[in-house]
Design a protein with these regions (language model features):
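C-terminal beta-strand-rich structural cap/linker in extracellular carbohydrate-active enzymes
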Residues: 617-643
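Conserved alpha/beta catalytic core and glycan-binding cleft of carbohydrate-active enzymes
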Residues: 105-108, 130, 260, 264-270, ...
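Active-site groove signature of glycoside hydrolases
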Residues: 318-344, 466
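Surface-exposed beta-strand/loop patches in extracellular or lumenal glycoproteins
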Residues: 27-35, 44, 578-599
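Substrate-binding/active-site clefts of carbohydrate-active enzymes
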Residues: 140-201, 207-328, 353, 357-365, ...
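Carbohydrate-binding surface patches
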Residues: 16-17, 555-593
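Aromatic- and carboxylate-lined catalytic core of secreted/periplasmic carbohydrate-active enzymes
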Residues: 447-448, 516-555
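Glycan-association/targeting regions that enable binding to alpha-glucans and other polysaccharides
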Residues: 1-133, 137, 200
């Protein structure tokens, strides 16, 4: 039986005020299993102005097998860090102290811990509440749907036309110039598909004019690509989405533009142009410049330029503001290459840029969200001063691939037409997809969220894949899809569906995953079961507020199975994900449920079940069993709270 451990997280169960202001007093609560220790003292170690301060906690009551300790802290900094100190009732030889433990976001430790992994209160403006409650649906416009007007859009010289049923071309130039003709009205015509899935937010990859199918090489930020139907088509799409209760966010590239961009063309070879300092030119003639990762078609912005800031990100007339206002009414931005924005050698203006964007958005419409693309360790940028959350891979996507994929043929075609024998794994040259256990999954999830404040973590995206990655289904057996999707919708963060995942689509890398949607196959035996799994799990996420706002407590981590609970006063959501058979008995007070009986009590029926699982209560504890390739989710009574 797994031992119960002291627990605290940033949810409302344990933190009295989720959106404090500077100077506010906040009550912090720690849950300790009755009989743990015994403890001589419990203290909170704060770190205001980077100097430790101590607050004694008091034992308030024992409820349902847990002792509750409370302490008050005053919020002195925009990011106010703290951790718990547990002093045991032990004696030691000589003058040595007895046993102590530290509890931070990384877990329970016997030695001192890093400030960066402290729990954190944020006294900065919070994201809209709807962000934590959303289920995101990502659309790559060229590959989603063609409207009846698609044939009327003039094809530019760069585009290589393709039929909707034609395979994606992995080799340049087709890789970036193959054009299927999906447009914004096509998305509008299929909004009811999004409603049938149950998603609540549409995330559009770029819609600005460009010279590629992905449009991350924008030639303007003041227009909508006519290939997509132009501005009027965007207005129609957002209006129809809002009428159905769907939020819509756009995709903005603040790190670079395309080399055809009007600003770059105005500055190229013209040092004295008003746009002359918008980019990193490397010679006096302004004919040589820095491209993003050495790519000459993607010149990098120089955020030292005050005029660039004024036009792009600062104030009511900026690009950032324009698309949040009528008649377009975007509900926020996902910012491409946010991790590199403003960073160039010795210069680091990232903090300034993200804070300016955030202020502009709050001034224009505080009910909008700001998400960053930061695909590796994003913690240092996610401290509440700018981004509300991030598209980041090591805290969820990479570990879920490592645990639940089973790669077969991993070879794929690269951009130059050569064959890479190793499976694509997020651009990491590690020999393919690593073979992780469930323990590895849990460890990575904790490690890469330990330095991110809870309020930001619940706004981070939990994608199985995106337009920049191979598709999960490429290397995962069908029976593992419900397991992976269940983790996406039940762990803290924003579940993400990349359009086509619900159809079971595959793709070897980021370019090959941008597959046209096979409309008309929804009722086919190959697609219908996957669609139904998506609908059931998304419905569970949107119907249970505890999955959006509740705390997280790991109950059992084995080599090939996970058991955890999302908790609030209103409900406990128990989640079991097992790739191999599991039998485990949890302590009686591990969950709020029923009183023990000598004869045992039949378990509740799961709210979702893929595979086979049971939950039973007896005097010995709570016994869980699960067959291989099983996901089971139970909704149980909420946590009993001290009066």
């Amino acid at each position: 039986m797994d031992a119960l451990l002291p627990h605290h997280d940033g949810s409302a169960l344990h933190v009295s005020t989720q959106t404090p202001a500077l100077g506010d007093t906040v009550t912090l609560r720690l849950r300790v299993p009755v009989g743990y220790g015994p403890l001589k003292a419990v203290r909170v170690r704060e770190n205001p102005d980077h100097e430790p301060r101590w607050a004694d906690a008091r034992l308030t009551s024992a409820v349902a097998g847990w002792d509750w300790w409370e302490a008050e802290v005053v919020v002195d900094n925009p990011r106010h860090g703290y951790r718990w100190l547990l002093v045991h009732e032990t004696t030691a030889a000589g003058g040595n102290a007895g046993r102590i433990e530290w509890l931070n976001q990384g877990g329970l430790h016997s030695i001192e811990t890093l400030d960066s992994q402290d729990f954190a209160l944020l006294a900065t403006p919070a994201a809209p509440e709807w962000l934590a409650e959303t289920v995101m649906y990502q659309v790559f416009p060229d590959r989603f749907a063609r409207s009846s007007a698609a044939d009327e859009h003039a094809k530019p010289e760069w585009a290589i036309a393709a039929r909707w049923d034609e395979p994606v071309d992995p080799v340049l130039p087709g890789r970036s110039q193959q054009f299927y003709g999906g447009d914004l009205d096509g998305i509008t015509e299929h909004l009811d598909h999004l409603l049938s899935l149950g998603v609540t937010m549409l995330y559009l990859t770029p819609v600005f004019p460009a010279r590629s199918n992905h449009r991350y090489d924008a030639s303007s930020f003041v227009d909508v690509d006519e290939l997509l139907g132009g501005r009027e088509a965007l207005i129609r799409l957002v209006g129809e989405a809002h009428a159905r209760g769907l939020k819509v966010i756009g995709d903005l590239t603040t790190n670079h533009s395309g080399d055809a961009h009007e600003w770059f063309q105005a500055a190229l070879g013209k040092p004295d142009a008003p746009e002359g300092d918008f980019y990193y030119f490397t010679n006096d003639e302004h004919t040589e410049y820095v491209g993003w990762l050495g790519t000459p078609t993607l010149p990098k912005f120089n955020w030292n330029s005050q005029e660039l800031r004024r036009r792009f990100i600062e104030g009511d007339d900026s690009v950032v503001a324009n698309w949040l206002k009528a008649p377009y009414n975007f509900d926020g931005w996902r910012v491409d290459v946010a991790n590199m924005t403003g960073r160039m050698g010795a210069e680091d203006l990232n903090e300034e840029v993200r804070q300016i964007i955030r202020r502009t958005m709050e001034d224009v419409n505080p009910d909008t969200v700001l998400l960053a693309e930061s695909t590796n360790d994003a913690a240092s940028d996610l401290q509440g001063d700018g981004w509300h959350g991030a598209m980041t891979y090591p805290s969820f996507t990479r570990p879920v691939w490592g645990w639940l994929t089973e790669p077969g043929d991993t070879s794929h075609v690269t951009a130059d037409g050569s064959i890479d024998p190793e499976a694509w794994f997020f651009g990491q040259p590690i020999g393919g997809i690593p073979n992780y256990s469930a323990r590895d999954f849990a460890e990575m999830t904790v490690r890469f969220t330990a330095s991110i404040p809870w309020r930001i973590r619940v706004g981070n995206m939990n994608p199985l894949d995106t337009h920049d990655t191979a598709r999960f289904r490429t290397h995962a057996p069908a029976e593992n899809v419900p397991l992976a999707l269940a983790l996406s919708v039940t762990l803290p963060g924003v579940p993400v569906v990349f359009a086509g995942d619900e159809f079971g689509l595959s793709g070897d890398d980021g370019e090959m995953s941008r597959t046209p949607i096979p409309w008309g196959t929804e009722t086919s035996p190959e697609v219908a079961p996957t669609l139904e799994i998506y609908r059931q799990l998304i419905a569970l996420r949107t119907q249970l507020p505890t999955l959006s706002h509740g705390g997280l407590r790991w109950l059992h981590v084995a080599d090939d199975a996970l058991v955890f609970a999302r908790e609030s006063v209103e409900a406990t959501v128990l989640v079991v994900v097992a790739r191999s058979p599991l039998t485990v008995t949890l302590a009686r007070n591990a969950l709020a449920w029923v009183e023990p009986t000598a004869s045992g009590v039949d378990g509740a029926s799961p709210a979702f079940l893929a595979g086979d699982a049971t939950l039973a209560s007896s005097a010995a504890g709570l016994t869980l069993t699960a067959a291989a390739h099983t996901c089971a989710i139970w909704t149980l009574p909420g946590v009993e709270y001290p009066a």
